[in-house]
A protein has these predicted regions:
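Extended, low-hydrophobicity, polar/charged segments
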Residues: 1-186
Length: 186
């Protein structure tokens, strides 16, 4: 996979697709500084490992989930290497059964395609239908890595800026959850 070895500060000088540009516009308007790495499509956590080394932070796992009836949707942010077990999360949020939302739902709610899901997509959730869940282990990290709504760039943003500036600006209050590192924990 091609990765530009340069780490850039701020938005790119060249033109990008509109949804990526909107991410940079939002971050700039909030005074949130970030570093950026450009690369080929990186749509799995495994593909992001070399990018993480350049950014100096972990790119979090972003899971877009729905209930069985497809009447509620959640965006879960968690450490990339942490295993995910739906049963444990379902119990914490009081939902009978969770599954991965469809690509159509990702587009409908976040204007994002699979492999590009990120907390920045919440800026496109104008009706505030998506409930944000954040694993508590992320809140202790200095910075969080994420895509700017497209998986050909990755950003490093201070966790405090995400929690204190970005989420309030997008009017999304997170619910913090505790997911175990060990699959056997309940």
């Amino acid at each position: 996979m091609w990765i530009d070895p340069n780490v850039y500060t701020g938005r790119p000088a060249d033109k990008r697709i509109p949804k990526e540009e909107r991410c940079y516009d939002l971050l700039d308007s909030l005074g949130i500084s970030f570093t950026r790495v450009d690369h080929e499509h990186a749509d799995t956590i495994e593909a992001c490992q070399e990018i993480e080394k350049l950014l100096g932070c972990e790119i979090c796992k972003n899971l877009f989930l729905t209930n069985r009836q497809m009447t509620e949707v959640w965006l879960l942010l968690m450490p990339g290497e942490k295993p995910f077990k739906t049963k444990l999360l379902s119990k914490q949020i009081g939902s009978a059964r969770l599954s991965f939302a469809s690509p159509e739902q990702m587009l409908q709610y976040l204007d994002i395609t699979p492999g590009s899901v990120s907390v920045l997509g919440l800026m496109n959730d104008k009706e505030k239908k998506v409930r944000l869940l954040i694993d508590r282990d992320l809140s202790g990290q200095e910075a969080i890595g994420m895509h700017p709504c497209i998986n050909t760039s990755s950003l490093r943003i201070r966790t405090a800026d995400v929690l204190e500036k970005l989420l309030p600006a997008m009017a999304h209050e997170p619910t913090f959850v505790g997911l175990p590192w060990n699959q056997d924990e309940t």
